[in-house]
Curated annotation (Swiss-Prot):
Entry protein name: Glutamate-1-semialdehyde 2,1-aminomutase
Subcellular location: Cytoplasm
Organism: Trichodesmium erythraeum (strain IMS101)
Enzyme Commission designation: 5.4.3.8
Cofactor(s) required for function per UniProt: pyridoxal 5'-phosphate
GO cellular component terms given for this protein: cytoplasm
Pathway stated in the Swiss-Prot or TrEMBL entry: Porphyrin-containing compound metabolism; protoporphyrin-IX biosynthesis; 5-aminolevulinate from L-glutamyl-tRNA(Glu): step 2/2; Porphyrin-containing compound metabolism; chlorophyll biosynthesis
Catalytic reaction list: (S)-4-amino-5-oxopentanoate = 5-aminolevulinate
Cited InterPro entries: 4pyrrol_synth_GluAld_NH2Trfase (IPR004639), Aminotrans_3 (IPR005814), Aminotrans_3_PPA_site (IPR049704), PyrdxlP-dep_Trfase (IPR015424), PyrdxlP-dep_Trfase_major (IPR015421), PyrdxlP-dep_Trfase_small (IPR015422)
Length: 432
């Protein structure tokens, strides 16, 4: 077995105290390491591709604060921009010129977005876009895909299990059945089920929402023709197509998955990268649809901190960095080196692994594959993944503490970082 030498004394003390103050000791469940076991790590600071815990241990980071840190943590251009704006105040609760700047940058970049509304999180963006789908179409039902995560709003917390996959049963206590009865589900990459749902619910479905590349049940890519098929089906049925690009937006291409796959939805949700590490979300799309949003139209949605100058500044500076020539070539090069290396090492060490990458997003399953949907992903060896995760952590490599989360690289990762990661992976996989 891998020798564990990590000193986590302070992490243990802080986490023990946190458990008396916050549910599970955390502000978001995955941070408690329930999926992988072992001592959760309490972090102290970040810089570039690295993260340090309160005990002074340094790690190469492939979580990237769950996606936003695509330029690397604490990038000086982002920090300098924030320092300058901070002197003017943290929030106005009123129109801010910086909103115009970021809005124009996003509209110029993302094919589907003609108008945009800023909010404060991806969850908030998806809540609002669902309301907008219903308002615009006059229909109540929506189709989502099993394993696709659209935040923790009641209407999206639907369990998509085998025999009850389309019955709209809630997936969390506290979510009434009547709230989710209009949420229909289908397996990802399954066009036939989507067609059947439209046939069974004529003129009742407002639209289809999905992660165009799944990142919240591990890294799962769309089959050839899947996104195009959804575009065709929704158009034929007078329904809307919504891409949840909170994770993929500005990560797998500057214009997101819709640029990468050349499929334009009607509406798009964004988050993470467009806030440069600060809390942010957004939804946007066709002008005729977005004109329904208050105060231009009757669909109400508001937010105290929406469009605040700090989040707008961090987003502007981040997008300026990403727009530089060669950015996505570099991200793809470094991520391909990592993903291909992990798959090759798995073969060398006789571990069954399925995975891949697109630009700065990657993932592996301890699973023979192929993995086309959440049911496939659930066949993974979670015990083996947990051992792999802990072994990597003990040797200074921080991966997402769940088999069902994608990984992220950044412009700050170097070939040396990748080589060290692969050398560690070989050592750990050899011990599994």
């Amino acid at each position: 077995m891998v020798v564990t030498t990590l000193n986590t004394t302070k992490s243990e003390e802080i986490f023990a105290a946190a458990q008396k103050l916050m549910p599970g000791g955390v502000s978001s469940p995955v941070r408690a390491f329930k999926s992988v076991g072992g001592q959760p790590i309490v972090f102290d600071r970040v810089q570039g591709a690295y993260i340090w815990d309160v005990d002074g241990n340094q790690y190469i980071d492939y979580v990237g604060t769950w996606g936003p840190a695509i330029c690397g943590h604490a990038h000086p251009e982002v920090l300098n921009g924030l320092k300058e704006v901070l002197e003017k105040g943290t929030s106005f609760g009123a129109p801010c010129a910086l909103e115009n700047t970021l809005a124009k940058m996003v509209i110029d970049a993302v094919p589907s977005i003609e108008m945009i509304r800023f909010v404060n999180s991806g969850t908030e963006a998806c809540m609002a876009v669902l309301r907008l789908m219903r308002a615009f179409t006059g229909r109540d039902k929506v189709i989502k895909f099993e394993g696709c995560y659209h935040g923790h709003a009641d209407m999206f917390l639907v369990k998509a299990g085998s025999g009850v996959a389309t019955l709209g049963l809630p997936d969390s206590p506290g979510v009434p059945k009547h709230v989710t009865k209009n949420t229909l589900t289908a397996p990802y990459n399954d066009l036939e089920t989507v067609k059947k749902l439209f046939e069974e619910n004529p003129d009742q479905i407002s639209g289809v929402i999905l992660e165009p590349v799944v990142g919240n049940s591990g890294f799962i890519v769309p089959d050839a023709g899947f996104l195009e098929g959804l575009r065709m089906i929704t158009k034929e049925n007078g329904a809307l197509l919504v891409f949840d690009e909170v994770m993929t937006g500005f990560r797998i291409a500057y214009g997101g998955a819709q640029e990468k796959f050349n499929v334009t939805p009607d509406l798009t949700t964004l988050g993470k990268i467009i806030g440069g590490g600060l809390p942010v979300g957004a939804y946007g799309g066709r002008q005729d649809i977005m004109s329904m949003v208050a105060p231009a139209g009757p669909m109400y949605q508001a937010g105290t901190l929406s469009g605040n100058p700090l989040a707008m500044t961090a987003g502007i500076k981040t997008l300026e960095l990403l727009k530089k020539p060669g950015t996505y070539d570099q991200l793809n090069k470094i991520t391909k080196r990592l993903a291909d290396g992990l798959l090759n090492i798995a073969k060398e060490t006789n571990n069954d692994i399925w995975g891949g990458h697109i630009s700065a997003m990657f993932g592996i399953f301890f699973n023979k594959g192929p993995v086309h949907n959440y049911d496939d992903a659930k066949k993974s060896d979670l015990t083996k993944f947990s051992k792999f995760h802990r072994g990597m952590l003990e040797h200074g490599i921080y991966l997402a503490p769940s088999q069902f989360e994608a990984g992220f690289t950044s412009l700050a990762h170097t070939e040396e970082d990748i080589d060290r990661t692969l050398a560690t992976a070989k050592k750990v996989m050899s011990s599994l």
